[in-house]
């Protein structure tokens, strides 16, 4: 099975399954001399981990990070960094009961047909638990970006029909749905709890803003920055749509309104608006990157649904495991990580673009 690596100069390879002994990531291309502690990586993992609030899965994983290689005396050595998180609260008993059924919305059927064999425990490799490694690597990417004064901010923009209108970044970590609009956060929480009570789930929209991105990140044609960002966030389980800048709204705007006119700010060229989401010709123009991603409602729900067995017989399924009623709040740090990994990779690639 290929497809577990991401990046070119700053490259990560994640490994592990939802109910295996553990998960992790190997990072290549991190420069030597970066001060890093397990506690710094742990802060990011704590934002993503299970059982953190009433709107997340009840699975209780500590997600304690262990640095296995690539760091000595508190600094990176320039060699591959290996990070490990052990699984401690996996319960495969519920999956034993439905292992011959294809769960609607999951990768059971496609994995079965493609590989002829699959790990049915919690989805195995297709589970969002795989993103532990991404978030851990993203913590290091964020620290490297911070040295260049680039900051990544993610939040929940929408849950179901409830959309954040008032954006205050200080409010993001003050509520369990990571919404920058305090009043809307309560409505989101109530909506998620109603869905959970009925055995259903909700989707949402996560927004990520990258501040301080310099002019020049991205390559022409196939390695455009917006193309790589889209691939990065689309690789997150449950993500079904991506919008950069004005995105789909651009289809309703005339060119005279959509074009970002150039002006002078602080003696430098800048754009008066940011409908392009900072990227022109696949290359960043120095404004804030704004990217939104749509996450579908959690596929595992405690409602009866029609399906078929591996032998092609009609069946009914009800998924009774421990699952998030809405993945948007925990998808925030994952989306931040993927944006950070994309930007740091392009940052290093840009260093070699001219003498």
Sequence positions of predicted segments:
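Alpha-helical support elements that line or immediately flank enzyme active sites
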Residues: 21-33, 129-150, 223-231, 287-289, ...
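Short acidic, glycine/tyrosine-flanked loop/strand segments centered on an H-E-D-like triad
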Residues: 99-124, 305-323
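A short glycine/serine-rich beta->alpha loop
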Residues: 11-14, 119-130, 215-216, 274-279, ...
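N-terminal, positively charged regions that mediate nucleic acid binding
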Residues: 1-59
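Glycine-rich, N-terminal phosphate-binding loop and its surrounding beta-alpha-beta segment
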Residues: 44-104, 108
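Glycine-rich, mobile lid/loop segments that gate access to catalytic sites or pores
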Residues: 113-221
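Internal helix-turn-beta structural module
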Residues: 11, 290, 300-355
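Glycine-rich anion/phosphate-binding loop at the beta-strand->alpha-helix junction
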Residues: 15-21, 199-202, 206-314
